[in-house]
Swiss-Prot record:
Signal peptide: none
Biological pathway: Metabolic intermediate biosynthesis; 1-deoxy-D-xylulose 5-phosphate biosynthesis; 1-deoxy-D-xylulose 5-phosphate from D-glyceraldehyde 3-phosphate and pyruvate: step 1/1
Taxonomic lineage of the native organism: Bacteria, Pseudomonadati, Pseudomonadota, Gammaproteobacteria, Alteromonadales
Any GO MF annotation of the entry: 1-deoxy-D-xylulose-5-phosphate synthase activity
UniProt keyword terms in alphabetical order: Isoprene biosynthesis, Magnesium, Metal-binding, Thiamine biosynthesis, Thiamine pyrophosphate, Transferase
Cellular component aspect of the GO annotation: cytosol
Family statement drawn from the similarity comment of this UniProt entry: Belongs to the transketolase family. DXPS subfamily.
The UniProt record lists the keyword Transferase: yes
This protein's name: 1-deoxy-D-xylulose-5-phosphate synthase
Enzyme Commission number: 2.2.1.7
Family matches, as PANTHER family: 1-D-DEOXYXYLULOSE 5-PHOSPHATE SYNTHASE-RELATED, 1-DEOXY-D-XYLULOSE-5-PHOSPHATE SYNTHASE, CHLOROPLASTIC
Length: 621
């Protein structure tokens, strides 16, 4: 149910940017307050990304007030912070459906709104896209402006600097807003800097600056002296030298919660030529005390009552697979100081908080730099250390070349703990772990494991830790484990060997991963044999031969794309054995899986027990 908009009188007049731009500037602070209040209650009712959006309220208001969106292009990096943008661009009354099946998308999405000029979800893409749009705008000669908004966390990714380096060379008109909400670049915030930013972006300063460049053209010594003098004067109060060296004109830092200062500065910058960067300082979770104190904990929230100032206590459940991994990592690190944990800025999500605290010298946060994280692991392995790279399936895509070139090619023993394999649910198509089994299967020297429960997960992680002949991967899903009684003793599994879990007849179901419980339920109804294959690569050749010889039909089940996945490996093996037979492959279809509750999606894809049974019976009919 949408909120009563009558409680937000100014926001009620700004359902679209066109309406927003009709408001007098004097009411923008009130609009920002109402927008923040609406966001607070809306996410409380729907769940979703929370703290980031609270920090970008004033920025969002200013951007849509100054720029003629959607004609002017506005690109958000990642998109966690774009909830206020969605509210102001005609989706206010649908915010209660965000991240839900059939509801609005969790991130900016081109198919959803003309105001979402570039679909996002992963970090570091906005400046590349903005540069391309700026080049296109210049060719079009229609006066279109281009703005990208990127957080300081995303600035750790190499793609960002690749794009900035190119933008500085091409020198097209574009604005990059650096939303610095971690104080990681500068703490020089206050009235002086706000005033300086407006001064530096004003016509007088920019005219003098550009005129000086023209006058000094062809006089390299004097030009260099003038440049250094300018940088020295600016550098006393602003940290812009790095951006200037990349070819950007740097403005800031300014208070990102002063909507009037943002509007005036952006108005000044709107018609500046060349690439510009506006550095703003914001507070993640702004306006809600618990989120301000713990922005990481309040990054994303379930449904909650904002008036309690507490997130609802989670119901007692089984540990998550991430927690199972984190405990295992601590257990082995206690006994082996060569064990190193690496994460690309996903410490909390990957279950590595305790490890980072107990073993700080063995913990490495590579920041949002997946390529670097993978090759960092390769380098450690070269020196006889035991690197464990904890990474989400969707983010390993970004380190694929490094997986091949830097790890597998050299047969380096790097263990990949791949979290969020399969359906992740509410974050949608940018985050579903649909492809990892497919893209890893093709890589020589890889060993790939898919546990059916938390005990197998621990044993497989230990197997990867013990394996020294090349890289290993253990792939597990998001969310709670199965509740299997924990076996503390860790034993390395025989490589490439599966288990028969149920003996049946005619139909043999080969399970890869945590859908085993549903497969066993379907197997009971069919009186089918069920095998827990454990290894996606290498496959258990002898077991598959045995099952093929003793059954009429094989069925493969995996929470991965059918194309190129584990089932494809079974088909390839049967062809090599010259033993063709009916094989039904069940898994994710050849499409990007939309957002929604994980259970709902699994059921819709017919990968729950009832759906698996239905698909097999239909195939046999």
């Amino acid at each position: 149910m949408s909120l009563d908009i009558s409680q937000y009188p100014v926001l009620a007049q700004a359902n679209t940017p066109d309406e927003l731009r009709q408001l007098p500037q004097a009411v923008l602070p009130q609009l920002a307050d109402e927008l923040r209040g609406f966001l607070l209650k809306s996410v409380g009712k729907s769940s979703g990304h929370f703290a980031s959006g609270l920090g970008t309220v004033e920025l969002t208001v200013a951007l849509h007030y100054v720029y003629n969106t959607p004609f002017d292009r506005l690109i958000w990096d990642v998109g966690h912070q774009a909830y206020p943008h969605k509210i102001l661009t005609g989706r206010r009354d649908a915010m209660h459906t965000i991240r839900q099946k059939g509801g609005i998308h969790p991130f900016p999405w081109r198919e959803e709104s003309e105001y979402d000029t570039f679909s996002v979800g992963h970090s570091g893409t906005s400046i590349s896209a903005a540069l391309a749009m700026a080049v296109a705008a210049e060719k079009e000669q229609a006066g279109r402006k281009v703005v990208s908004v990127i957080g300081d966390g995303a600035m750790t990714g190499g793609m960002v600097f690749e794009a900035m380096n190119h933008a500085g060379d091409l020198h097209n008109d574009m604005l990059v807003v650096l939303n610095d909400n971690e104080m990681s670049i500068s703490e020089n915030v206050g009235a002086l800097n706000n005033h300086l930013a407006q001064l530096m972006s004003g016509r007088f300063y920019t005219t003098i600056r550009e005129s000086s460049k023209k006058v000094l053209k062809g006089m390299p010594v004097i030009k260099e002296m003038a440049k250094r003098t300018e940088e020295h004067l600016k550098g006393m109060v602003v940290p812009g030298t790095m951006f200037e060296e990349l070819g950007f004109n740097y403005i800031g830092p300014i208070d990102g919660h002063d909507v009037d200062a943002l509007v005036e500065t952006m108005r000044n910058m709107r018609n500046l030529s060349g690439p510009q960067i506006l550095h703003i300082m914001t507070k993640k979770g702004r306006g809600y005390e618990p989120a301000e104190k713990d922005p990481i904990g309040w990054h994303a929230v379930p449904k909650f009552d904002p008036s309690t100032f507490e997130k609802p206590a989670s119901k007692p459940s089984n540990p998550t697979f991430s927690q199972v991994f984190g405990k295992w990592l601590c257990d082995v690190a206690e006994k082996d100081k060569k064990v190193l944990g690496i994460t690309p800025a996903m410490r909390e999500g990957s279950g590595m908080v305790e490890f980072s605290q107990r073993f700080p010298k063995q913990y490495f946060d590579a920041a949002i730099a997946e390529q670097h994280a993978v090759t960092l692991g390769a380098g450690f392995a070269c020196e006889g250390l035991k690197p464990v790279v904890a990474i989400y399936s969707t983010f390993l895509q970004r380190g694929y070349d490094q997986l091949i070139h830097d790890v597998a090619l050299q047969k380096l023993p790097v263990l990949f703990a791949i979290d969020r394999g399969g359906i992740v649910g509410a974050d949608g198509p940018t985050h579903q772990g649909a492809f990892d089994l497919s893209f890893m299967r093709t890589v020589p020297n890889m060993v790939i494991m898919a546990p059916s429960d938390e005990n197998e997960c621990r044993q497989m992680l230990y197997t990867g830790y013990c394996y020294n002949d090349g890289p290993t991967a253990v792939r597990y899903p998001r969310g709670s484990a199965t509740g299997a009684p924990q076996i503390e003793e860790m034993t390395a599994l025989p490589i490439g060997k599966g288990l028969i879990k149920r003996q049946g007849q005619k139909v043999a179901i080969l399970n890869f991963g945590t859908l085993l419980a549903s497969v066993l339920t379907a197997g009971e109804s069919l009186d089918a044999t069920v095998a827990d294959m454990r290894f996606v690569k290498p496959l258990d050749v002898e077991l598959i031969k045995e099952l093929a010889n003793s059954h009429d039909v094989l069925v493969t089940v995996e929470e991965n794309a059918i194309m190129g996945g584990a089932g494809s490996g079974v088909l390839e093996l049967l062809q090599q054995l010259k033993q063709p037979m009916p094989v039904l492959q069940l898994g994710l279809p050849d499409e990007f899986i939309k957002h929604g509750d994980s259970g709902e999606i699994i059921a819709e894809l017919k990968l729950d027990a009832a759906g698996i049974l239905e698909q097999i019976e239909s195939y046999l009919a």
